[in-house]
Amino acid sequence: MSTKSKIFLVLLVFCPLSFAAHWLGWGETTVFILAGLAIVPLAAFMGTATEEIAVVIGPNAGGLLNATFGNATELILAYIALKEGLIEVVKATLTGSIIGNLLLVMGFAVFLGGLRYKEQNFQPLAARLNASTMNLGVVAILLPTALQYTSTGVEETVLQNLSVAVAVVLIGVYLLSLVFSMGTHAYLYDVGVAENMEMPELGEDVSEPEPPTEEEKPNLWLWTGVLLVVTLGVAVESELLVGSLEVATESLGLTALFTGVIVLPIIGNAAEHATAVTVAMKDKMDLSMSVVMGSSLQIAFFVAPVLVIVGWAIGQPMDLNFNPFELVAVLVAVLIVNSISSDGTSNWLEGILLLATYAIVALAFFFHPTLV
């Protein structure tokens, strides 16, 4: 068992502790902290279970399962907050997840990987495609906000209808991107394969790699059960976290904006963060970039649109009119990541630049007076 798995197993102790804190009245702040720590290992085991099931059901269905459950923790947490009417916190969590993935996680991955390897390489074409797709995500959340701030008397129903329409477009693009990455152009996303293959002509079949030696497959029913249990655990812990959010943030002296943009995304993405950094330190920067960019794209093209549609359906209308300050931070993150990843190489100094940018953004949100 790896050291990372042992750490996550130890962190499971916070699950019963969070229940005890809730039922025994240890205080909302204690419940908030313990529930947040409990979500971290549950999210990790959700990812492990998804990967094990994917091995059994095959690459296509497995890829779709991974794509669906890739940000399940954030989706569950955001849905519960949305159900409680904390719409601005949900929006802040979405933008914070994108910012955290692009700056904090990629920063640590590039920095720590760069300390072990002088220069690391990754597929520049896939990076450019991801960057272009991310640009569309920025446009999708920028335009509804621009409509609100450049027009007078825009009714809430107009913004809601626009947001639902944009959400449908984004989900359509997300589905097509899955077809692209797992079907027509899968070779671009196969780590260690793309750089050794020539670009096929249109209509030309891409030869399949030699099948790996047959190994004993994981127990499908066991890992399905694990996935169901940890998903339920994430839902319960998210209820505790959201229920104590407002009182806890006030007692800790944090604004809801800072909590949504910085604190909650770190909790929800911690397991994914560990994966991206670990593989980067093994000189698998292609895989690390895939984890980071894939997670960010899922937030922008799947989680956010689904929440818009679900909010509309359950009577908690959420539009894509974001806090302008959040949009500036997302735009900064996307621009600097696009600049750094465009050449297909990375070094530790670029990691420092990403981490420094995240630190500045986090400080700006900490001192931002807006209470959402």
UniProtKB/Swiss-Prot annotation:
Gene3D superfamilies noted in UniProt: NCX, central ion-binding region (1.20.1420.30)
What the protein does? Answer: Ca(+)/H(+) antiporter that extrudes calcium in exchange for external protons. Plays an important role in salt tolerance. Does not transport sodium or lithium.
Kindly indicate whether the keyword Thylakoid belongs to this entry. no
Q: Name one GO cellular component term.
A: plasma membrane
Q: Which UniProt keywords apply?
A: Antiport, Calcium, Calcium transport, Cell inner membrane, Cell membrane, Ion transport, Membrane, Transmembrane, Transmembrane helix, Transport
Query: Record keywords: rRNA processing included?
Result: no
> TM segments?
7-27, 29-49, 62-82, 94-114, 134-154, 162-182, 222-242, 251-271, 294-314, 320-340, 352-372
Q: How does it sit in the membrane?
A: Multi-pass membrane protein
Q: What happens when the gene is disrupted?
A: Disruption causes the rapid degradation of pigments and salt-sensitive phenotype at alkaline pH.
Family classification: Belongs to the Ca(2+):cation antiporter (CaCA) (TC 2.A.19) family. Cation/proton exchanger (CAX) subfamily.
Which protein is depicted?
Ca(2+)/H(+) antiporter
Major place of residence:
membrane
Compartments where located: Cell inner membrane
What is the organism field in this record? Synechocystis sp. (strain ATCC 27184 / PCC 6803 / Kazusa)
Single Gene Ontology MF annotation: calcium:proton antiporter activity
Concerning NCBIfam families, the annotation shows: caca2 (TIGR00846), cax (TIGR00378)
Q: Which Pfam families match?
A: Na_Ca_ex
Activity-pH behavior: Optimum pH is 8.0.
List this protein's GO terms for biological process: calcium ion transmembrane transport; intracellular calcium ion homeostasis
